Amino acid sequence: MSMKSAFRMRNFAKKLLLILFSAFLGLAICEIGLRLLGFKYSGSTWRNDPLLGWSLRPGASAWEVDEGVAWSKINSHGYRDRERAAPKPQGVYRVAVLGDSCTEARQVDRDKGFTSLVEEELNRRHCCGERQVEVLNFGIGGVGTGQELLLLRERVWKFNPDMIVLQFYAGNDVFNNHRALNTSSPDKAPYFLLRNGKLELDESFRQGRAFDPTYIKLKGVSADIMNSSALLQLVYKLSRLYAQRQEMARLSGAGQTVAPSDTDAPPPEYQRYLSYLPPAIPSMVEAWQVTEALIVELNKETSSHHAPLLIMTIPAIHQIQPNPKIQEAYRAKYKIESLEYADDRVERHARANGIPVLRLSKPLVEEARRTGTYMAGFANTPPNSGHLNERGHAVVARELVRAICEIAATRAAAKSLSKN
């Protein structure tokens, strides 16, 4: 190589290093600036899961800023909870709570979620004896009753719970148990089907590379990198906004309107009120039948482990609307006889099978009207929308503590009588 060529190479290398350094410095300044400005974006704590379709990623952490502002830290077992030992230590009484996003409660700080509040109050009251009480949060956003049954069978028992609480949400739990109704993730979850009166598991969702362990790990690493960078979060947020606007423009340009039909897949906008009505389409009939069969199966599962089951119904938003006029207008618009249809049906079915039920719509709406505050919604969302806020979680905790203490007292009395 001639001296002239060598000089050009060194000059090119210097320029390249200068460009790279300038780019790095610019990105670093942007990152620092965004952090100083307090920029946050709701990060991902999810992972693909070959058992459930999806679950929370062990060790992940991220902000939630779409509803409320809260920090989510996932423990080493993959739940939004503090670290728990498996198996259960001696001298501990455990309550395991199965549920969806209402139980996961990423919209509020962990110590303000109802599972943490219940644990604190039960230890203060000592209604479960002198043992230390732990209330384990197994909530995973978006799951249905079938996934909760699988979770209980395969992953919860190793924690040796003494009682199981199944949180049921009328707004979408029935939909999530049927592929045609589960519009958010129809092909990403396992489903139970009723055939000749028996539940059969459909696991066809596992096709493709999405559930390959290496792929899951790489996706988790990329999500962790995204969660740790304000700049990457901003880029992702802008790309999502652009995609959403493109989709809205496409739908607007189509100029189509839809109405309820007797098909198996009603339009998503009508699913908002379908759970308040008796099933009138085949998919809803099937979804309710599967849901009720799953409740029976959950009861069999808990009974075989000598752990009592309590079903706790979290109401949908319109059930806890504090303004009676708004509530009545909604009922009239969609010809709803009772906003309590789903909760009524679940309670009847559960009690017919010897399962106690805790219903929360009445105490939540009474508290909202008594205090003049909403039990759902946050400063960055419309009032009475989305998920329960801290006030709502406090009411849930109060009622759940009462129910658990009643069950514990009944079992203690029965045990005492059996000894005599």
What positions do the PLM features span?
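Membrane/wall-proximal cationic-aromatic binding patches
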Residues: L37-G129, G255-Y270, L364-P383, N420
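Conserved SGNH/GDSL esterase-like catalytic core that processes O-acyl groups on lipids
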Residues: V69-K73, A85, Q90, R94-A96, ...
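Serine-dependent acyl-ester chemistry module
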Residues: K112, A170-I355, L360-R370, P382, ...
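Solvent-exposed, acidic/flexible segments
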Residues: V95, Q107-D111, G141, T145, ...
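Solvent-exposed, polar/charged alpha-helical surfaces in well-ordered, non-transmembrane soluble domains
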Residues: S116, E120, L150, E154, ...
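N-terminal secretory targeting modules
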Residues: M1-R94, D109, K158-D162, V174-H178, ...
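Histidine-centered active-site loop/cap adjacent to the catalytic His
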Residues: L18, P356, N380-N420
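Generic structural signal for small/hydrophobic residues in well-ordered secondary structure
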Residues: E31, D100, E148, I164, ...
